[in-house]
């Protein structure tokens, strides 16, 4: 199995609910290590750039407005099959379809305010990590 890194964002709705620690605990219990983290208030430009792949989609403006509505926690997770493991922890995009016990089932209220973002593959993970973190901000967890 490959050790991977993936980007995770705890979105404004979950930050406002004060569940950052509960979500971090789930990452760690699943064997994922946090190798970088920061809280940020995204600018409109940052959110538009990050979600540029969705620019032509009808939900783009609402997504950007939501992502700048409050602070977010941005972290890089590392571990065996980190991308798939994080996506499993998150649950389906729509919390109504998310399996019980997943982050979205427990903390999200709608498909729009769905608590977390996670990279969907190795290439996007690398791009998304580089969007928010310089390489010297990533701290290998060797102990």
UniProtKB/Swiss-Prot annotation:
**Top-rank EC class of the record's enzyme:** transferase
Co-factor requirement: Mg(2+)
| Entry annotation: catalytic residues | 117
Entry's SMART domains?
NDK
Subcellular location, record wording: Cytoplasm
The keyword Glycoprotein belongs to this UniProt entry's keyword annotation: no
The reactions it catalyses are:
a 2'-deoxyribonucleoside 5'-diphosphate + ATP = a 2'-deoxyribonucleoside 5'-triphosphate + ADP; a ribonucleoside 5'-diphosphate + ATP = a ribonucleoside 5'-triphosphate + ADP
Primary location class: cytoplasm
Q: Where does ATP bind?
A: 11, 59, 87, 93, 104, 114
InterPro entries in UniProt: NDK-like_dom, NDK-like_dom_sf, Nucleoside_diP_kinase, Nucleoside_diP_kinase_AS
Biological process annotations from GO: CTP biosynthetic process; GTP biosynthetic process; UTP biosynthetic process
The terms describing its cellular component in GO are: cytoplasm
| Keyword Aminoacyl-tRNA synthetase part of the UniProt annotation | no
Q: What is its EC number?
A: 2.7.4.6
Query: Keywords in UniProt for this one?
Result: ATP-binding, Cytoplasm, Kinase, Magnesium, Metal-binding, Nucleotide metabolism, Nucleotide-binding, Phosphoprotein, Transferase
One example of the protein's molecular function in GO is: metal ion binding
- Role of this protein: Major role in the synthesis of nucleoside triphosphates other than ATP. The ATP gamma phosphate is transferred to the NDP beta phosphate via a ping-pong mechanism, using a phosphorylated active-site intermediate.
Task: State whether it acts alone or in a complex, and with which partners, per the record.
Answer: Homotetramer.
The family note in this entry says: Belongs to the NDK family.
| PANTHER family referenced in this protein's UniProt entry, alphabetically | NUCLEOSIDE DIPHOSPHATE KINASE
Q: What is this protein called?
A: Nucleoside diphosphate kinase
Q: Per the UniProt entry, what species is this protein from, by scientific name?
A: Methylococcus capsulatus (strain ATCC 33009 / NCIMB 11132 / Bath)
- Lineage, please? Bacteria, Pseudomonadati, Pseudomonadota, Gammaproteobacteria, Methylococcales
